[in-house]
Structures are given as structure tokens and as C-alpha cells.
Amino acid sequence: MTDESDNYNDFMMSDEDMDSIEMEDEENDVEGDEGQRGGQEWVQNYEQGLSLWNDENYVAARQVFLKTLSMLVSEEELIEMRCKIHRQVLECWCKILMYGEPDNEQSTEIIADFRNFVELVNELHGKANCSLDLSSMFHHVTMDFMPNIYDRTFIPGITDDEESSKWAKMTFKTTILQILQGSWVCHTFPEVGLLLQQELHVLQAWIKTFDKERDLYAISESLRKDINTLNELQLILQCYIARYIEDQHLLCNEGEVFRMCLNQLDQKCNESLAVAQRSDINLILHFSKALFLILFELDQDDLGDGNKVTGSTCVRRFVTIHKFYQNIECCKEEFWECLKNLEELGTNKFRFERFMQIIVGGFVLCAMIMHRGSQTRLAGTSGNADINPFDYEQLRIAPDHIFVDKLRRIYDVFVGLQIQEMHSCLIELECIRAPLSRLFDQVCYLIQKRKLFSEIAPIYSCISIQDLRQKLQIDPSVPPTRDEILVHLMRYCMQDRGINFKLDLVADTVTFYSEQHSEPLHDAVFSETRMGHKSHKSSISKDRAIVEDIKAAHEMPEVEYAHDIGILESQVDSQSHSKSNTKSMSRHVSGHDPDSFGQDTISFFDTLRLARETYQGSNIDNSVYTIAKLTNEALQEISNDVR
């Protein structure tokens, strides 16, 4: 019953009572220490330093702690207490450096304090009954001293003004880590030595990135052999980003390493809420994902037939059109996340001018590719593909208004299919054209394709390829080649679109058919020609029956069958010529004159060959059915007589 009443009294105790009890306990502890240590004055100074520390007055607290240490210099039995106080001095420096960079005088004092700390720790080496956890102490000092050294430090976004200060800061902290490595603790406790070695390795790699003749490939190669820490992942991904922005070059065999680093950083963000909430890490992660999609998931021929290349040594591959638009949408989302991370970091345009331009440009280009990417929304893609990207707040309040206006102009040109204005827009965006060349190439391809089939095809029933080259010309000095025009046509044909066309590679012409003629070509021509022959139906009824028999026998429409053997002639008078040749052939066949039969047969097929080679698709007239009838009649007679 006594225990229950005591618990009840403790539960009902007020906060003031608890504070008074804690103060009494602290006073008892201090009185015990004073009684044990002879009531020395250093205890009061130490308590004063702790009070200043709690008040976040770290400069004054450090001075008091140093004064306390000077009182204990001759106290060999209190060497462990001296280590504790010395650690408090270093903790004060860590807090001070969080709010600014050290000047030359402070740097000298910090180095001296760290040297004294290491010497004091070395004095404890071999001492029995040491109650200090030196391994934990070194670990905390290192981790408390290193935070924020990499925050807001981006290789692609660092300016010349920041470069010298960042270099000095990292060089200074490298010196500190080298001092800590001189302690016996690093050799006795492997985990401490490994931690210091990893941090030192990353710092030295960072210092190399500030060199004007830096080799980012060598830096990334030295880091990727043993990736253990978050800082190493950050740096190696930044090396990839900086290398691509500078020279747009990454080796094919680096794709898997890039993917591995991305997966590891993504996993760390998923496992740790503290890491996931860091905007600088998220910026690197999302930009790296967008870069990986552009480099290794998109290809110049992604809007082609969708065939895949197997057995390639490169990670790049052809993808289907459906997969292509999914990748573009993912790339757009990654750039969008980068914009939000930049907003959270509060960066100004002078520090991240080039980096931000690439992010904003990539976002707008992906939106352009997704705009009217298909007549119906592709499965697996969002329904906001046609939302104007400049309606987003991040672009409306972007600090670089001039650059955003340039992007707005190319967006309007693309949507309006103003292909003649595209070249000047590309020149204005030359600053980001190299790193985003793959997206620019896709934009140029799409505006040509949509111009061809949205504005040219509905207007022109027949147009030459040379005229198409002029109408689809982006660069005034370099028109598209004939092969490029044919590639546009063949890809469109393979995608099973609504507009049908007929390609004449001899005359280099393209004949377009409207959407209502989406049925096969021979059916459309058959219906049109039949209407033209309606007035002559009575005169050719017998011939028509023969042609229908041939059509049924060969399971082909008459026009298609005639075209298959190449007899579509443009001259009306060729009808009588073909008829006389047919009768001549029939007479020789019936008379069984082998020589005459062979000569006339050769002459007949020479005529067919000549007709095919000189055929002009735009001059097809009503004589086609008579020609088809006469030719097939002659072939039928030849076949019967030979049997």
C-alpha cells in the first residue's frame, strides 16, 4: 500500500516540484563532486560554461571552457574530465561554424584546439580503467564537424565567387580530418578510422572538382569503386551531371553505374525521412533521373517503328511509341520536381543560372513533345499533357524572365506549327541546346511531321518531294534531305494513321487521300472510276464481264491487278495500240508461228515495261479499265493456246 501511495504522489506532483527536486539532485551531485575533488573552483566555471551552452552563447561558452581547462593542466588524475571539457570546446566550434565561415584567426584557433584534443586523447592510450567511450567521442566530433559542408554545393551551379570560399572551406576541413587521423583511436577502432577515411576521400574529391583542369571521369571512377556514404553518392551523381552539362558526353558502359547510384540514393531517401526532406539531395536525385531518361531511355529514332535492338553494348535502345511518351512524361515530372526543389532552396538566378535554365528548358520541351502527342491520350499517361506549362506558378515567378520569354516563344511556334520561325527560336536557346539536344531533335521532328500531316496533306492532293523539302525546312541553309522526307512518310504509314497517301519514287511525288478514303487505295479508285464510266456502261458491258472474271480469278481488284503488271498508261490512244498488239499476238498464237509469237511477246512486254517506267500517277483517266481488259484478255488467250 505504501508503494501505491508513493506512485500516486509522484504522479500528482507539479512541474515546479519536479524542477525543485531535479535542482536538488544536481546540487547534491555537485556537492558530492566538490567534496570528492576538494571543492575546487573549476567546477563553478564548468557549470557556467554549460549554462552559456544551453543559452546558445557558444563563443562565450568556449572561452569559459578554455579557462576551466587551464585550471586542470596540472591535474593528472582529472585527465578524463579534461577530455570531456575539450570535447565541449570542439562542439562550440561546430555550432559557431554553422552560422558562418571562419576567418584566418579563427581557423588558426580551431586547428590548435583540435591538435590539443588529439594530444590529450593520446595521453589516455594505455591507461587502465578509462571510463570514456573514445570511439563514440571521435565519431560524434567528426559527424558534428562535417554537416552542412556539402549543403547547397552543386558542381553545375557553383559560381566563380563561391568557388574560392568553397575550396578554402573544404581544404580547411581536410586539414582537421588529417589531424584526427593522427590519433591512436583511429587505429584501435576500425569503424572510426573508416569513417574518417571516407569523409577525407570525399573532401579530396570535392577539392579536385574546383580545379580548372579537373577530370570528372577520374573522380567519379575513384568514388564508384567503394560507395558507402550519402556524400559519396551525392558527389558521384554531381560528377555525372557536371560532365554532361559541360561536354554532353557519358560513356555507354557508365549507364549501369549511373543506374546503381540512382537506386542507392533513392533507397536512402525511402529509408530515411531526414534524407528525403533535404531539398539539395532531392534536387540531385530528380535531375539525375531526368538525365538518365534522356541519355539511356530516349533515342533519336524513338518515334519510329518501335523495333528494339538486341545484343547492343549500349544501354540505349529503341522503344515503342507508347513507351516513348511514358518516358517523356516521367522526364517532365522529374524536371518539375527539380523546379520545386530549387524554389525550396531559395537560390538566386546568378548562382544557378545555367543549371536552372536547363531544368526549365527541359520541362518546357517535354511539355511540347507531350502536347498533341497523339490524337487520343495514350494509356498510362496523364490527362494534363496539353496544359500550358507557363501557367504554372514556378514559371510565372521565375527570376530569369528573358529566358522564360524565349521558351514561351518556341512553345507558341511549336503549337502553331510555324515551322519557318523555329530556326530563330533555336538560335535564341543555344545556351541549352547542347545538353538538351535529344529533346530538341524530337521537337524538330514532331513539328515537321505534324506540319506535313496536319496542314499540307489536307490541302495538297499531290505534291512533289522537292516541294515538301521546302515547306518542311527549319534551317534556311540546310533543307531536309529526300531520305528524311521519306522517313517521315514511312513512319507515319507504319503507325496506321488516318491519312492515306501514295508514294511515287520514280516521279518523286506524294498523293494524299482524305480521311473519308481510309479504306484501301484500290477501293477508292475503283468507286471513283466507276462513276466516270457510268455513261459508257452499255458499250463496255461485255468487256466489263471479262474484267470481272479476271478479277475473281486472281482475287484482286481490276485496277490493282492492272497496276501489278504495270500497264497503267496515260495516253488515251494507247488503247487502240494495245488492242492491235493484242490481236496480232492472238493471230500468231492461233497460227502457231513460234518465231512471230516470240517476237511479238517480247515486244508486248517491252511495251508494258516502258509504260511502267513512264507512268505518271496524276494522269490516270478512264482508259485504265479498257487497257486492263485488253491486256488481261490477251494474256488469257496466250495462256489457253499454250496449254
Curated annotation (Swiss-Prot):
Residues 1-33 have a biased composition (Acidic residues). GO terms for cellular component: COP9 signalosome; cytoplasm. Its main location: cytoplasm. Transmembrane segments: none annotated. The keyword Cytoplasm applies. It is found in: Cytoplasm; Nucleus. Residues 331-517 form the PCI domain. Residues 573-584 have a biased composition (Polar residues). It comes from the Eukaryota. Keywords: Cytoplasm, Nucleus, Signalosome. Residues 1-37, 573-594 are annotated as: Disordered. Component of a COP9 signalosome-like (CSN) complex. Component of the COP9 signalosome (CSN) complex that acts as an regulator of the ubiquitin (Ubl) conjugation pathway by mediating the deneddylation of the cullin subunit of SCF-type E3 ubiquitin-protein ligase complexes. The CSN complex is involved in the regulation of the mating pheromone response. This is COP9 signalosome complex subunit 10. It comes from Candida glabrata (strain ATCC 2001 / BCRC 20586 / JCM 3761 / NBRC 0622 / NRRL Y-65 / CBS 138). The lineage of its organism: Eukaryota, Fungi, Dikarya, Ascomycota, Saccharomycotina.
